Amino acid sequence: MAKAPMRVAVTGAAGQIGYSLLFRIANGDLLGKDQPVILQLLEIADEKAQKALKGVIMEIDDCAFPLLAGVTAHSDPMTAFKDADVALLVGARPRGPGMERKDLLEANAQIFTVQGKALDAVASRNVKVLVVGNPANTNAYIAMKSAPNLPAKNFTAMLRLDHNRALSQIAAKISKPVTSIEKLTVWGNHSPTMYPDYRFATADGKSVKEAINDEVWNKDVFLPTVGKRGAAIIDARGVSSAASAANAAIDHVRDWVLGTNGKWVTMGIPSDGSYGIPKDTIFGFPVTVENGEYKIVQGLEIDAFSQERINLTLKELLEEREGVKHLLG
């Protein structure tokens, strides 16, 4: 018997990431090749943005996707998020020239407060929310705090792009396929302070750390390359990474819904106090997922260098949180 369609809401749907994302969701990449979907697409109430969204929907229609059970355009989160099973919060205020980080935080806090309240009011009680729009961790925290009637665990931030970037750098370094590498993680904030950590990683069951055996490469090449990859792409292409971000969003939600078969992935999730990270801080952790529920991988040894890096990214997150506290009432 055919499955009932799942409702997937996407914000910033006419943007660059949206354009790379929507066709893949409609093709079954997000929720599985037997799961029909209804797309509920949100864009700002600006005539140009709404017109662009109509154009995107025309193209989606023209693909005649077998799994697509419907697609609707919205300018109001209260209708876009109605009964949503999955919400991908992609739209965010980008940092403009001369804009301080503080201004960026405040501008986004307003957007994510409104969206959190709308999710709280109308989304499915089991909605899985992924925040892609930056600063992703703090935006997810704001949305979560604005939705007191939804479980905090429903709100996540995307660190999968950082995870995938780290994975490909390691695969290239040790000349192994990415599929052979397991137990990699990225701790902390989706920002250059993140800490990609391969101390526990294996390739075909053998230690990656021993295979690389180069602390100088780790500190001087690997960490900065992964941490500043977004800036390097802007420098090369003139625009920010969209297709790779969309791909990471698909990976994150697919694994959250369909499970990871015991494999580690990285998700930005509300802390339960593990590894000394204050409760409710949205932080990148190694997790496994089963039956739609993620669990933090426990019992990992944190050496002095790792603790220093984790403290650094946590400090930044707590500063961001402090910067938006007055907006959360």
Curated annotation (Swiss-Prot):
SUPFAM superfamilies: LDH C-terminal domain-like, NAD(P)-binding Rossmann-fold domains. Substrate binds at residues 95, 101, 134, 165. GO terms for molecular function: L-malate dehydrogenase (NAD+) activity. It catalyses: (S)-malate + NAD(+) = oxaloacetate + NADH + H(+). Pfam families: Ldh_1_C (PF02866), Ldh_1_N (PF00056). Keywords: NAD, Oxidoreductase, Tricarboxylic acid cycle. NAD(+) binds at residues 12-18, 108, 115, 132-134. It is an enzyme of class 1 (oxidoreductase). GO terms for biological process: malate metabolic process; tricarboxylic acid cycle. The active site is at 190 (proton acceptor). Its EC number is 1.1.1.37. The keyword NAD applies. NCBIfam families: MalateDH-SF1 (TIGR01759), PRK05442.1 (NF003916). HAMAP family: Malate_dehydrog_2. Catalyzes the reversible oxidation of malate to oxaloacetate. Belongs to the LDH/MDH superfamily. MDH type 2 family. This is Malate dehydrogenase.
